[in-house]
């Protein structure tokens, strides 16, 4: 598959005050993964680490794990997806020390990126990017 997608806010049910359930989120995930695959795209699970054990059965091909070092969710993603995890750590939540700890702990097994949240273009003030 050449193209990739990563729908965000799979965990919206946790903030919906009962309007959405975990079952609703999983049903929506199945719809999105089916559509992505029909279009020839790979699709990532993003957020809702509690769904990681069922992620592949929901149709996800890999995971985008934001701040999993901060929230101690990395193990759930790597257990479910193996090396098919892309971890992103941010300067405003744990800083470079957190990123370095992530690299030391998992950097030889998965891709880890340190990036500014605003995705500032290279050469502009505020741009931050590292990878391990």
Model-found features: residue ranges?
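Short, small-residue-biased leader/transition segments that mark boundaries at the very start
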Residues: 1-2
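Hydrophobic residues within beta-strands of alpha/beta enzymes
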Residues: 5-7, 63
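Surface-exposed cleft-lining segments at the edges of enzyme active sites
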Residues: 10-23
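Short, well-ordered beta-to-alpha junction loops that form the rim of enzyme active sites
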Residues: 8-10, 47-48
